[in-house]
Amino acid sequence: MTEKKKLFVLCVALFCFMAVSAQQRMSVSSPDGKLRFSLKVTSESVSYDIDYRKQPLITNSLLGFSFDSGEFGRNLKAGKVQRKKIDETYKLIVGKTSSVRSRCNEMTVPMQEPSDSGRLINLVVRAFDDGIAFRYEFPEQKAWDSYVMYDERTQFNLQGNPMALLMYLPGYVNTHEGVYSHVRYDKVARKRLIEMPATFEFDNGVAVAITEAAIRDYAGMYLMKEKGGLTGKLSPKLGQEKIKVEIDNFPHRTPWRVISVADRVGGLLETNILTSLNEPCRIEDTSWIKPCRTTFTWWNGNVVPDSTFSP
């Protein structure tokens, strides 16, 4: 090999090494090892993949935000990853079972802008045997203690062409009622709001449902198919078009973004992942809560004194 060829090979190897070293990769798997969430942080973007039984379900899906203080999602550096195992049991007041065992592996990834005064957001990921969930945490920090959010850019780029069961909505202000469509993923209409949960069944029988949990002090999320796949769309504040969320002080947490996974569609009904992610019941004494019949004022008129509902 000539000196020029040696130099060329060395330069190519060095370039490849620099490209790989510029990427930060980390992952977390479910207790049974079947589900895996993989995160990739580069100078250009933050993205994730989800594999089930070593087969890709969701790939190259971008994460990020648009704030009044600027975009968050580029030129980030991942800090030291914190991991823990969660294994707890809790009682359900209502539901499919009286007692639930919740097991998952958790990974927390600090993501910060380069400067010492750069904004910091933690990505918290939980891998259950029956799903993946992730949320963002805004810890207390000197240079940033509030925000006005214009958008949360969370993508769900499904692989293949599964059957989709979903409901289109006319707008952010709606009754959450309508006719469901059962179509192939490539036939899902673009630029139309989609209610959550949205369900997808792959040809091998694996089923996925995309939804959210633990919504507090935050906008509700819908889905919309755009170029590259599904993107989360936050409902604007009342009377606003641009502003989605305003937070006056930290710490703060977003809702969980939940991808429930099962070997068959029926398995999605059997999961308790949403109650495991929601906050515990705040009612100390629940003995008075019993099965009963109820009625709703928006069906039968203003039967409640001083009600603001109209028949």
Where are the language model's segments positioned?
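N-terminal accessory beta-strand-rich subdomains and adjacent acidic, glycine-rich linkers
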Residues: 25-283
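Phosphate/adenylate-binding glycine loop and adjacent helical scaffold
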Residues: 290
